[in-house]
Amino acid sequence: MDHRTPTPDNPWLALRNLTPARIALGRTGTSLPTGAQLDFQFAHAQARDAVHLAFDHAGLASQLSDRGRDSLVLHSAASDRHQYLQRPDLGRRLNEDSIATLRQHTQANPGGVDLAIVVADGLSALAVHRHTLPFLNRFEEQAAADGWTSAPVVLVQQGRVAVADEVGELLGARMTVMLIGERPGLSSPDSLGLYFTYAPKVGLTDAYRNCISNIRLEGLSYGMAAHRLLYLMREACRRQLSGVNLKDEAEVHSLESEGSASQKGNFLLGKG
């Protein structure tokens, strides 16, 4: 006689091919199968590692230089990772040395710019390392015809979203785009977030920002994120505002695979 606890068939199992989300995990008796439990622990470890991974700003600056882009490396008022996690307010402001660096740059390059791109580690430096350059490649390809002037790419260590407001104000930028590592999830330790602000200045709330989230190969493609950002930027320049009063109404004809532009259609329905 077989005394093993039977594992019931799981009708949701086929849906696991459509999403990295933790669905259709199955069960053994009243508990999760061993494999699902181990996968959960591994995903949790990946999320913790993403939060504490050091920002390789020197490596990113070197890659930007190889593409002909200048960069400025700055630091928030949070002195280290521990203080960054304990004091979110310090991650929203620059330290004194960084403020002085931006002021010197502005004095040497008066007149302001249309766009300041700010990159910060946030809660996942892994996301920044993986997705910043591929996204910027797609964005700059699509934005070339607009003729916007831009400042050097600003790399902020221990930075939070609002630090881009201070950067933009000091540079005299009409718009800022913040690329930042999002809080890791159990299936997405490397999601890149994007925050767009028109007329940045210190003290703005989230109501004045537009967010485009989950930029990564398994989420929103680089091309689609760039398309949505450009729509917001063009509308912001026309209407002179951003945030809750500016809705993302960019036309999206179909989902595009980053690997092949010919793969179109809704992933839930199969290939179009």
Swiss-Prot record:
Pfam family of the protein (one): EutC
Location, primary (coarse class): other
Endpoints of the signal sequence: none
Subcellular compartments: Bacterial microcompartment
Cofactor: adenosylcob(III)alamin
Single GO MF descriptor: cobalamin binding
Binding site for adenosylcob(III)alamin: V161, E182, C211
The protein's annotated pathway: Amine and polyamine degradation; ethanolamine degradation
GO cellular component, as recorded: ethanolamine ammonia-lyase complex; ethanolamine degradation polyhedral organelle
GO biological-process terms attached to the record: amino acid metabolic process; ethanolamine catabolic process
Keyword Transcription regulation carried by entry: no
Keywords per UniProt: Bacterial microcompartment, Cobalamin, Cobalt, Lyase
Catalyzed chemical reaction(s): ethanolamine = acetaldehyde + NH4(+)
Enzyme Commission number(s) from the entry: 4.3.1.7
Manner of cofactor binding, per the entry note: Binds between the large and small subunits.
Claim: Lyase is one of the keywords in the record: yes
Assembly and binders: The basic unit is a heterodimer which dimerizes to form tetramers. The heterotetramers trimerize; 6 large subunits form a core ring with 6 small subunits projecting outwards.
Biological role stated in the UniProt entry: Catalyzes the deamination of various vicinal amino-alcohols to oxo compounds. Allows this organism to utilize ethanolamine as the sole source of nitrogen and carbon in the presence of external vitamin B12.
Protein family according to the UniProt entry: Belongs to the EutC family.
The protein's name in its UniProt record: Ethanolamine ammonia-lyase small subunit
Organism annotation: Pseudomonas putida (strain GB-1)
The organism's taxonomic lineage, starting at the top: Bacteria, Pseudomonadati, Pseudomonadota, Gammaproteobacteria, Pseudomonadales
